[in-house]
Amino acid sequence: MAQEKNLKKYSLDGFLPQADMQYIDQIRGKELQKYKELLFDAERDGFANQLEYIGDMPYRPSKEIKASKLGVGMEVLDHREAYDFDQTIKFMRNSGVKWARLQSGWQRAEQTPGVYNFDWLDHIVDSLLEAGIIPWFSLSFGNGLYMDVPPCRGSYFYSPTVFGEKGITGWKNYCQAMARHFQGRVSYYEVWNEPNANFLQKPGSELSGKLVAEPPEEYVKLVKVTSEALREVQTDLKVIGGSISGCSLCNEYIQGLFDAGIAEYIDIFSYHPYEFIPELYWPSRLQFIRDRIAESGKHIEIWQGENGFAVKEREANQARFLTRRYLTDLRLGVDMTSFFTACDFRNGYKSTGVFDFGIIDAQDPDCYKPKLAFRAMQSFTWLFDEDTKLTNVSFEIHPYETPWAYTTRPVDDLYPVVCGFRKGNIPIYAYYHPSHILSSYEARTVSIQMYPERWSTFEKPVLIDPITAKIYRIKNETNCSDGNYGRFRQFHRMPMLDYPLFLTDATIFTEGLENFKYAQREDK
């Protein structure tokens, strides 16, 4: 038995902040016009009978969010000085992220033996803390004062441990100087960056025309030296190890790290799972790491420490990737996830042009501006704060008007990712198709079947598009009752895209909203 009903009309007037049209035009103006065919629009894409636009997603400054798992990379501000931090922080204050990864810049901080200049890093750290963002350091890279070899691409991608007592002592002194100087401000220290991806290479290997990475044992030796040096100064800090690049299957390297005893020296294991399809292989690699940690008998968190996507001519591609990267890590229970990176790199990274992995556009050095991915980030940080918890849900996607049992359509054509969260008693359901980021994907019409849990409030269903930041009222639903299967709710004629859409209750925007402060935008 099925009974379709029209849902009561409601609005969010008075509960959402007034739209700042100048800001919306800045983000959506030329960019949205240029890429309009790539972005979902309920009316244009044929879903107006089911979806009614009722408002835009709010945002919260990072300072107004107590805690979350969402972070951003702010790397390459060391001797390479790849972008203007002060222009970038204006935007990041309103991003909602709570973590920022920094590279410590030994080569920039110590240019005379034993003399450390942290003024530039003080400014960055203090600005982030004032914005409500927790900085964490990647201790990298080497320093020519202690390494008797020429730099590689302007940096010393060599382990201090292979340069004898001189290299080890110089590195230990530097790490301890960092810990003393930033004690009380920074408590998380990562050892190096991507040791398996030529950022920890054998000295001289570049001269042969083929870069050779140091073996896992050498990296673990560096981790041991670093961890012991740091803890002599600050016993309660957290040491992060691994920083593994995942461009290819690297389980052998990871196994080598644990065989060499890395678990004895770290509190957090970090990983960089680069793929064009963020859902591909990451769950199995994550489980491989969890199994190695379990074998060690240690309590070690796992962070997704760096992963991003360049614009590649279309801002929407990057925005799609950000939403899928964040959601993949959240649904798999990763303890922190960092998107690479905050701002395009203009200097010190490529010989020419702009390295456009940033969610802030730096094409014009005098006028930085946010990309679509920045707005998507704001949507995510609003939804996924310390009160939002991963939960099991009864939530299914089916071909529109055709049950799976009676269709001959290939499963791969419609195979969705689905997951659920709860914010108090309000459910948040997510669903999408995990296609290749660069593929052409048109909105598909599906039916959603769900059984709301007893704890949930779900009387005013809305659909959220995190990239366009639009909120839609769902107009119709069908309450189904069957003697064999019991009762469930069904929403027909719903869109499925290649990035997450969120189905939740409108009260998520009204309950307790008086506690949220909507600051004046500082990034116009």
Q: Could you describe each region identified by the protein language model?
A:
Residues 6-22, 31-56, 326-442, 456-462, ...:
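Aromatic- and carboxylate-lined catalytic core of secreted/periplasmic carbohydrate-active enzymes
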Residues 435-457, 495, 511, 516-518:
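Surface-exposed beta-strand/loop patches in extracellular or lumenal glycoproteins
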Residues 1-98, 105, 505-524:
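Mature N-terminal, pre-catalytic/accessory segment of carbohydrate-active enzymes
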Residues 264, 274-351, 362-380:
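Catalytic-core region of carbohydrate-active enzymes that cleave or remodel glycosidic bonds
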Residues 82, 149-268, 272-291, 311-327, ...:
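Active-site cleft segment of glycoside hydrolase catalytic domains centered on the general acid/base Glu
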Residues 103-110, 137-154, 195-197, 246:
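Aromatic-lined carbohydrate-binding surfaces of glycoside hydrolases
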Residues 83-107, 123-127, 131-140:
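Catalytic domains of carbohydrate-active enzymes, especially glycoside hydrolases
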Residues 473-524:
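C-terminal beta-strand-rich structural cap/linker in extracellular carbohydrate-active enzymes
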